[in-house]
Amino acid sequence: MSSSHTVTVSMDVEAGQKNKDKKGISQDLILAYKTLGVVFGGLVTSPLYVYPSMNLTNPTEEDYLGIYSIMFWTLTLIGVVKYICIALNADDHGEGGTFAMYSLLCQHANIGILPSKKIYTEEENLISNQPVVAGRPGRLRRFIESSIIARRLLLLTAILGMCMLIGDGILTPAISVLSAIDGLRGPFPSVSKPAVEGLSAAILVGLFLLQKYGTSKVSFMFSPIMAAWTFATPVIGVYSIWRYYPGIFKAMSPHYIVRFFMTNQTRGWQLLGGTVLCITGAEAMFADLGHFSKRSIQIAFMSSIYPSLVLTYAGQTAYLINNVDDFSDGFYKFVPRPVYWPMFIIATLAAIVASQSLISATFSVIKQSVVLDYFPRVKVVHTSKDKEGEVYSPETNYMLMLLCVGVILGFGDGKDIGNAFGVVVILVMLITTILLTLVMLIIWGTHVVLVALYLVPFLLLEATYVSAVCTKILRGGWVPFAVSVALAAVMFGWYYGRQRKTEYEAANKVTLERLGELLSGPGLRRVPGLCFFYSNRQDGGWLTPVLAHYIRNMRSLHEVTVFLTLRYLLVAKVDGKDRVQAVRRLGPAGVYGCTIQYGYADAIDFEEDDIAGQVVGALRERVVDGEEEGERVEAARAAGVVHVRGKMRFHVGKDTRLFDRVLLGFYELLHGACRSALPALGIPLQQRVEIGMLYKA
């Protein structure tokens, strides 16, 4: 009887595991289909503009074979080996991108700049879902931990990587849509350039207006379009290979690259600024990881995107070998006339989709940096109940829209944008290589020989590309570079202002003894209700100086007051059981403290999460002595909840040193324009109170 029962249970467990695996596979396949409409748009539509962006002069068959060989190995090494096989494994709880890798490093080594970036339980034990390699901190880790300069350089590198991804996001939509719509001018030469520009701008405006409905809804509409594109272009490529140059795949031999550079020398090096466009968009599949999953991106890339690009570029090159001067319209000229208009429609729709990958990636990295307090607060909306990494930012969306339209109207031609394109893309890839190397050494504990086998070839490849694209800066490449630098300046200005506020709070702290004196002062009243008083710091038994300012001027404090510290962590998500921590009594009657912890990918909504209920429950469970005190806490909550937050501002006077006057003045400008913290936490309007306080810089 017992044996039969054991067999039945075992079979049930196995059946359950199989069902779970089937469900996981089917979910990955569905997500893989959706990635076509979001992640790979920029990469898979690159055949529209790669050859037209090259400044070729009297190209020969050998030149085209060398160019195809370069593109094939670039796609294989950077796309397959670097991103699909290695980088996607360096995720932070499902989140990708340069900033996610930086946060991952901060979790496993003491290299972060801002405080309060670890998850603590009640016993203050560090929680990590990533394995730490014991006994292998290495000299590199110790050096970075001990050097403030190295730590700041690492932070700056991560910030630049994020900003350059956004700079890339400005050009991708513009060049994709312009290159597609430019196909009208082939059969209809009378169509003017301003008409193409206006139509392209109108299409992009429509795309940006769709973003508020969420990535899932947008990708569900866009995935069929990209599926048609990834099927149609390689089919035409195979036809072109068969008709024009069946031996094109001999160019997969790397010796054609050597011959290309031996023949063209400096000119060949300059042409790398065009061939690099074949991999633009690959960086988005890592940054968009939070919107999907690692396996879904790997499935889609290896089964669809990579074969499609290899065959499409092979077909284009085969056509151009027989029509050497058609490179300036290298895509539409290689499309057979009977299918020209169907391909024009698909290309236009695919170009619209291509814009989505960088838009989604931009939303992800902005959300990460806002939560970690490296960027001014902008509104971030979670557009999916099932996928927490799927977000939308209205301010970011409309700023991108204006910049994209400005690029179209400013450059006016896809070929001119091609000169500007690729500068920041390859820099993002180089930064990814550097951060990934640190992840291998510090977190994964990879043997130094294997790390060298990764680092040396990719560093040489990407550094060579960087040297080539730098020649394009004066021909328009300065635009995305300038946007990236401007964003980095915003982040540094914000970070500097936050650091100065932290220093001021430490110098003007309110100790628990001082709190007792303030509460025992004459004329102070305790009013009914539960008050959450937001304090940036509770470390070492002291509170924010805004508290003393509040008590001195209001002459009152709520009957039950909880000093609440929000801790935004360098981890993607915090488990619900670790949300409310460090609950304790702070001395005077009815005064408590606690910490609320969130990861940068968590959806934050105090009302929906019932934070007030969680804190009251934690107080009754861990702190409150006796039924009477517990009833007092519950009665205070029933009387009304209020959230009080100090809004400390810098007063920049004439006697302030010039450096601080510039940076803190810039910070105040940003601070005045950004959103308040309380609405971002999902706190109802009637429960919000903000107390202003000036600090002389």
Curated annotation (Swiss-Prot):
GO cellular component: membrane
Intrachain S-S bonds: none
Protein name: Probable potassium transporter 4
Cytoplasmic side: 1-29, 88-152, 211-217, 293-300, 360-390, 444-447, 497-697
Lipid bilayer topology: Multi-pass membrane protein
Source organism, top-level taxon: Eukaryota
The entry's keywords: Glycoprotein, Ion transport, Membrane, Potassium, Potassium transport, Transmembrane, Transmembrane helix, Transport
Chief localization: membrane
Example GO biological process: potassium ion transport
Compartments it resides in: Membrane
The species this protein was found in: Oryza sativa subsp. japonica (Rice)
